[in-house]
């Protein structure tokens, strides 16, 4: 019997969309998509996250005015219920995905654990 692991992975992806975690994430995502203010703020927040990550990778320090701007955006994000709901749903979805990854990679992890004995 030939097993096509990609068929199984695609089936898992379809099943994922039926989970409580994915549905909650999709609902939160849609709420932001349908709110121009939340969508704009979330986009700005993502741009800042990317800028911070790039600065960290290149070992640069942000300028004080950048930090002030970033703090102001972060404060707005904390007050936006839709963005907070998305972040909470995303965290739950990521937990599920991590658990699934642990299951899928269990044979590899077990093999490596035998090297330590």
From Swiss-Prot:
Gene3D superfamilies: YheA/YmcA-like. InterPro entries: Com_YlbF, YheA/YmcA-like_dom_sf. Coiled coil: none annotated. It comes from the Bacteria. Pfam families: Com_YlbF. Belongs to the UPF0342 family. This is UPF0342 protein LEUM_1212. It comes from Leuconostoc mesenteroides subsp. mesenteroides (strain ATCC 8293 / DSM 20343 / BCRC 11652 / CCM 1803 / JCM 6124 / NCDO 523 / NBRC 100496 / NCIMB 8023 / NCTC 12954 / NRRL B-1118 / 37Y).
């Amino acid at each position: 019997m030939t097993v096509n692991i990609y068929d199984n992975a695609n089936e898992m992806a379809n099943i994922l969309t039926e989970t409580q975690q994915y549905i909650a994430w999709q609902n939160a995502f849609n709420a932001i998509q349908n709110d121009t203010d939340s969508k704009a703020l979330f986009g700005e927040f993502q741009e800042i996250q990317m800028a911070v990550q790039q600065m960290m990778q290149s070992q640069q320090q942000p300028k004080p005015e950048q930090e002030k701007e970033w703090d102001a955006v972060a404060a707005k994000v904390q007050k936006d219920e839709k963005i907070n709901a998305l972040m909470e749903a995303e965290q739950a979805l990521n937990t599920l995905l991590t658990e699934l990854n642990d299951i899928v990679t269990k044979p590899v992890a077990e093999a490596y654990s035998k090297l330590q004995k």
